[in-house]
Each structure stands twice: as C-alpha cells, then as structure tokens.
Regions:
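Preference for long, amphipathic alpha-helical scaffolds in soluble/luminal domains
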Residues: 1-244
C-alpha cells in the first residue's frame, strides 16, 4: 500500500474509533488536563480555543463580549511560571484579533533548550513566521530530543499532551516549514516522513495509544494536515505537467 493510501486508511479508521456519539471529531481544543486533575487553566484555554474556532468559522457574533473580555484577562495572567500553558494558549490563536508574539516565543524557546514541550510548541509557532534557517536548526535539535525521550521510554502518560501529542505539534511545524522557501526542503521532507511513520506505529486495536483524548485529537489533526499538504502538492505538480 502506498503512503497516501496508508494515511487515508489510518485517518478514516481513527475518525471512526475516536468519534463521539454524533459521528464527528469534536473541535473542542481540550478534553483533559495537564496533570490528570481538573484545572482552571486548561478549561480556560479550551474555552478560548472554542471561541477562536467560532470566530474563524464566522460565528463570532454569537460570543458574549463580556465573557470574552474576562477570559482574555485571565489568560493574560499566564506567564513565565506557566510556560507550557502559555505556549498551549498561543497554539489556539487562529484569528488576526489575537496575534502571536513571536519575539517572546523565540525568547522562551532559547531559554529552555531541554524542555521538549516548550521546544515542540515554540517550534510549531515559529515555523509559520520565524526565519526559515533558524527554524530548521530548531527542527534538527528537536528531533534529537524526541529520539532521546523515546529511547528512554518517556511518554508522559496521564498528561493532557503526552509525547505523541508533542510529536504531532512537531509534525505540524515541519509541514508549515516545508511550505516555505528553504534550502533544506529535502531534509525537512525526511523529518516529516519520520514523524508520520512514528505516529502511525502508535496505533492500537482501540485507536491511538494514548491516555489523553487531546493527544489523540492532535495526532489526527496533524495527520489530516499532512494529507491536505500532500494533495495540494500533487495538485500543483499536476498543473505544472499540464502546462508543459
């Protein structure tokens, strides 16, 4: 079976297995917590992610301005002592009304080189707007962190986003980087293939092998994104051939 067929099969199978009663994958950003307990921060980030999805889909007029303002005020308190939550909050931003402070993200990334969660989320954010050569160097360093973590058996079970969830963010960042003009495109492609293969190996008879539904959703999202980019690439290649 080709990689395309394999990806399609996996995504369709996991959509069925992970789907709630209404038969669809929910777009609710968070369904668990970082520490396997109820946490107001994760709930707030979840609410923000849902509101951003509503804004992006054209339903922003249904959002209570008062609630949105109070939520923004709370989320703006996430700072240096809560780096992972801060970056996770940044990952939910989708509209122009909520731009990501890439300078601050870059600073956080530089100050915490061995924190794989910080590195994965900052990479996914910077891959869209950071300098391509710097982002590629970060991608290589991040791959080394993942290799070390998997070799040591560190999966961060019972966390909101375990190692596979972070790897899904890594894949999304690589796909974003691949769409940009970079001299390292072939190397980026190799890293993309490696992440896809690794994530596909995470399947079990019951879907993705993770305690966290949020992680499962992130992996599905990343694999869907990979499929989208593949079809876009194939479409562009076909157009070039037809022109010739």
């Amino acid at each position: 079976m080709s990689m395309t067929g394999l990806l399609q099969d996996v995504v369709q199978t996991l959509v069925f297995r992970q789907a709630p009663a209404n038969g669809k994958i929910g777009s609710f950003a968070v369904r668990d917590t970082f520490n396997d307990k109820f946490d107001g921060r994760s709930l707030a980030v979840a609410a923000f992610g849902l509101l951003e999805e509503m804004r992006q889909q054209g339903y922003g007029n249904l959002i209570s301005p008062t609630f949105a303002k109070r939520l923004d005020g709370y989320l703006n308190t996430l700072g240096a002592d809560q780096l992972e939550f801060y970056l996770y909050y940044q990952m939910q931003k989708k509209t122009k009304a909520y731009p990501v402070n890439l300078q601050l993200v870059r600073q956080i990334q530089a100050e915490h080189p061995n924190n794989i969660a910080v590195q994965a989320m900052s990479f996914a954010l910077l891959a869209k707007g950071g300098k391509a050569d710097e982002v590629f160097a970060q991608a290589q360093s991040l791959q080394e962190l993942f290799d070390q973590a998997f070799a040591q058996g560190k999966y961060f079970d019972h966390k909101l986003i375990d190692l596979k969830g972070l790897q899904a963010y890594y894949l999304q960042g690589l796909l974003s980087l691949y769409t940009r003009n970079t001299a390292d495109k072939k190397e980026v492609e190799k890293l993309i293939v490696a992440q896809i293969v690794s994530l596909l190996k995470s399947r079990s008879a019951y879907g993705l092998w993770s305690w966290s539904e949020t992680t499962n959703y992130l992996v599905l999202e990343a694999l869907n994104y990979a499929l989208d980019q593949y079809y876009i690439h194939q479409s562009q290649a076909t157009k070039c051939v037809l022109k010739v």
